[in-house]
Amino acid sequence: MPQDRSLQLNQAIEAAILQLQQSPTPEQLAHTLTVVRRCMQAGGQWIVAVEPVPGAGQVQPRVVTTADGARWWYAFTSFEEQMKSPDTVKSTFLADIDKLFAAALSAPEIAGIIVNPWHCTLQLDKELIRIIRPGLAD
């Protein structure tokens, strides 16, 4: 997918997230999840921070731990969002949203994916991921 198209899709997601933050209603959540689903179906991608797996010669998504102790992968809708991270994100890759969702559902050690964890944030637990992407199982 051309980068410009992916950027446009992610801008739609950011706009929906901002609307949800301003009006956190079930209807606005449903709208935001629909926007994410449409972007996913159109081949949308997010920027995923990764870190090396010690001794394995592989990388894995980086994890952020929330105050309740839950562990989450995180992804960004743009490089601008990535730059808001308090940590230096050294390695990233573009991941198809649907493949990222499938991987998250198959990883028992994480609670879900946080999109833009430091600004314009959307926390997608596994239940919400299943709503966006029906047919995926743990």
Where do the language-model regions lie?
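An interfacial alpha-helical scaffold signature
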Residues: M1-D138
